[in-house]
């Protein structure tokens, strides 16, 4: 019996960096600390911002809800793919 190889996850480092930069931009524009946002959203903001973890769409949605943004407003200023 042959076992299937696990699928390799596709990673796009440029996209990851672009999303993280947008999260930092929004958080900083409100003068919020990583800890403040983490405490109020339950998200691990420090891990996202250091690149240790990548936010899922659900995490991005929670982040947007906290800042009263739509996903469209979050992604609109991004120039991706470059």
Residue ranges and their predicted role:
Residues 1-29:
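A short, Lys/Arg-rich alpha-helix, primarily the initiator
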Residues 29-47:
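Short alpha-helical DNA-recognition segment
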Residues 50:
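Short, conserved catalytic or interaction motifs in soluble domains
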Residues 58-73:
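DNA major-groove recognition helix of helix-turn-helix/homeodomain DNA-binding modules
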Residues 73-82:
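Short amphipathic recognition helices of helix-turn-helix/homeodomain-type DNA-binding modules
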């Amino acid at each position: 019996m042959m076992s299937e190889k696990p699928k390799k996850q596709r990673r796009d480092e440029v996209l990851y960096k672009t999303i993280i930069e947008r999260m930092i931009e929004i958080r900083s524009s409100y003068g919020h600390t990583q800890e403040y946002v983490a405490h109020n959203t339950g998200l691990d903001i420090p891990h996202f911002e250091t690149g240790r973890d990548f936010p899922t769409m659900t995490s991005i949605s929670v982040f947007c809800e906290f800042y009263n943004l739509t996903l469209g407003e979050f992604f609109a200023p991004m120039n991706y793919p470059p």
